[in-house]
C-alpha cells in the first residue's frame, strides 16, 4: 500500500540519493559552474530540487499527507532526472574533456561508494 511505497522511497533516498546529491553538489556542479558560464540557473534549479527532496523525506516518514506527498515526490524526482538527462549531461559531454571527465568520474565514484557504507 501507500505506507510501503513511502518506506521504499525513503530507503531509496537514504541508500542512493543522499550520496548522489552530495557527489553532484560537491564535484559535478562546481566543475560545470567554473567550466561552462551561463548555466547557474539550471544548476540552482537542480540544487533546489535536491533540497525539496531532502525536506520531504522526514514528512514522508511521519506519514502526514502521505498520498499527495508520494505523488509529488515521484513527480519531482522524475522532473529532476529528465532535466539532468536533457540538459546537464549534454552540457558536461560538450564542455568537459575526457581527462577531466575521468578524474571527475573517479571522484564521483568515491563519494557514491562512501554513501553506500
Question: What are the language-model segments listed below?
Answer:
Residues 1-117:
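Small-residue-biased structural context
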